[in-house]
């Protein structure tokens, strides 16, 4: 497989046709997150947005197909345990952040109710690791920050503003 593939149909724009032959995979960032995932001052929380996109990628199911027929036989999770395991160091490395920035972004997502942090003691290659971070995604809250207009449309009473920005308490400021 080379760079150029043939495109069966044409859009009339050669660049669009060429990009249409590329199979992009990975993280997807809905544009609405830049409006719904924000700091208290109203600025988009870019670090939290990128980390959330990665978390959602891991929670999206992958297709399981029969090798011979190619038929879809089921869906599987992409990670081993009941929840996604990630470390702050992994997230920092992936997104070019400091560990402190990654930690703050994850805490912001938890404060918004989009994820829940779970800390466990685990054993890896015979070594005990305390406080291993597992991330539980909260689908209902993810839906609310991704489709806020649908939440407002479906309410019978006047829509209430969904608290989406992160308010840091003085204790949280001391923790960071």
Regions found by a protein language model. Name each.
Residues 89, 99-157:
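Winged-helix/helix-turn-helix nucleic-acid-interaction surface
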Residues 1-93, 97, 107:
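Short recognition helix of helix-turn-helix/winged-helix DNA-binding domains
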